[in-house]
Regions:
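Mobile, glycine-enriched helix-loop/loop "lid" segments at the mouths of ligand-binding/catalytic clefts
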Residues: 1-7
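Catalytic loop of the DD-peptidase/beta-lactamase superfamily, centered on the K-T-G motif
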Residues: 7-134
């Protein structure tokens, strides 16, 4: 959905939607089960298991340089280490948090994007982590 004049408007699949070339992975087309697998591979790699990539590569991607990662935002607080990533191209919003210490991940996908969506996703993420441990 797009957000126009205060209303969510469905975007038909026939719309020829183009992103700016500076968008590195914007609007990636992936099935949820495949994205879950992608995140699971990252979790396994962070915990030392070689799979699609070597474990050292995952560690570099997530923590390679102090206060920097490759495509992930790092959060260090209250004894926790999280890799997070969010994305939108204006018609959806996604958020993933990977708890690198506990080996858990939380993934939220929506089919709309506006401030209310972002706020709802943040609240849902907080509740998921409260209820399922992170």
């Amino acid at each position: 959905h797009s957000f126009e004049n205060g209303k969510l408007i469905p975007v038909p699949s026939t719309v020829d939607y183009h992103l700016d070339y500076t968008e590195p992975a914007g609007d990636i087309n992936i099935k949820l089960k495949d994205y879950i697998k992608f995140v699971q591979l990252n979790l396994q790699g962070i915990h030392g298991e070689n799979n699609y990539l070597k474990a050292d590569t995952y560690k570099f991607i997530h923590k390679g340089i102090e206060n920097y990662s490759m495509g992930w935002y790092n959060i260090y607080e209250n004894g926790k280490e999280l890799s997070t990533h969010s994305g939108t191209a204006g018609t959806y919003y996604s958020l993933v948090h990977i708890d690198r210490i506990r080996g858990k991940a939380f993934i939220i996908f929506t089919n709309s994007f506006n401030q209310e969506t972002q706020q709802a996703v943040r609240l849902l993420m907080r509740k998921l982590k409260e209820n399922y441990g992170s």
